[in-house]
Amino acid sequence: MADPKVDLWATDEVHFQQYGSRCLMWVPPEETDPVLLHHPTRKSVGYFGAVRLRDGKLAFHRESERFNAVTFHTFLKYLRQASSRSGRRVVVITDNARYHHAKLHADWRSQQAPQFVLDFLPPYSPDLNPIERLWKLTRRLCLHNRYFPTLEDVVESVESKFSEWTSGNEVVRKLCAIN
């Protein structure tokens, strides 16, 4: 049974590329050789994201720089602030990226304990992180079979979907449920 005094969050980083992915799609039978537009670039936008597993609430932060200890620390402080209103203990599930263990934010994490702690997944096991399913759904709903002339179009598409999930969502809750 879930502890009502603990909020469990799953967190991860993700990149969404401007170069769209093509999946199954319907093409009228009279078009024998359809032309599919795509932008010849590998530009991408990165996000830190966290899902509260009890209600499917999404917290996200667009990252303009690379993911590193400084940007992760900034996101942890953002997540701490977003989750502090509940008064519950916060446990954050995260992977073993090197910068998640950085000394830069180790002191801050020890000051926040036991109210805010990181729980690391086993090495090389991203499939155990519930938020990975949300990234897959986001790609399917926002990026598959679509043409984005600019990177800002990708940002707009992704963030419009994310904004629907910031107050909690039953679909996200069920998708990220741990059985």
Feature locations, PLM:
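C-terminal anion-handling pockets and recognition modules
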Residues: 4-8, 131-179
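Extended, low-complexity cationic-aromatic segments
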Residues: 1-77
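Short, glycine/acidic-enriched loop or turn micro-motifs at the edges of active sites
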Residues: 15, 98-99
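RNase H-like polynucleotidyl transferase catalytic core
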Residues: 33-41, 110-130, 147
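Acidic beta-strand-to-loop metal/phosphate-binding motif
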Residues: 10, 89-95
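RNase H-like two-metal-ion nuclease catalytic core shared by retroviral integrases
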Residues: 94-96, 103, 119-141, 151-154
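Short, basic/hydrophobic alpha-helical segments
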Residues: 71-91
